[in-house]
Amino acid sequence: MKKKVIYSIIIVSVIIILSVAVTYAVYTFSAVVNISGTSECFDVNYVKGQDIGSDSNPAKFVLANNYTKGLSSVIKVNLKDTCTITNGTGTLYLNTDTSVTSSTILSGKVLKYQVLDGTTPVGSGIVSSAESIEIYKDIPITTTVKTITVYIWLDGNLVTEQNQNEILSSVYKGHISMDIKSGDK
């Protein structure tokens, strides 16, 4: 009879120890979370801010024959050294605010943009609508800081005597934004 009680105690103890061990193993396995590819991994610095013009200080243009005479905004982007992923891919957008931007400047098709990756031109076009425009895509993002400059300017070659005063009194407000995805799977 004593042996039965001792065996019962040993069996119950083994069951309890196994239950605790299995529970601990399951908890430990599910508690390990490897965060990778989230926004914490990417460092995006809008050097001059995201806005090109603002409600209190809307951008006013002068006629120019190239982008260097226009307004600009700079973005510095890279992958943080502390991340477990090795690369990412970004897309840069130009978003026009219709509540402030003159329709004349858009319909005249004289407002242009130029995108530089460092000193290399990578995108250009005409801002002719108030929608979000994809101005640079498939941007490789690594731990090396990438400097991207966006210029907006009025192309003086496209302005006529008939619309010059109206265009020069026009206002533009927009901002740049970037969408980044992890390159690691």
What are these regions (language model features)?
Residues 1-12, 21-27, 51, 101-157:
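Signature of Gram-negative chaperone-usher
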Residues 2-67, 170-172, 181-185:
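Short, polar/proline-rich extracytoplasmic segments that appear immediately after membrane translocation
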Residues 18-19, 28, 66-122:
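Surface-exposed interaction patch
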Residues 32, 42-44, 49-51, 68, ...:
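Generic "edge-of-domain/loop-turn" microfeature
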Residues 39, 58-72, 130-132, 136-145:
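Solvent-exposed, conformationally flexible loop/turn segments
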Residues 40, 52, 56, 73, ...:
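Polar low-complexity intrinsically disordered regions enriched in Ser/Thr and small residues
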Residues 71-88, 93, 135-185:
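C-terminal, structured domain-capping segment
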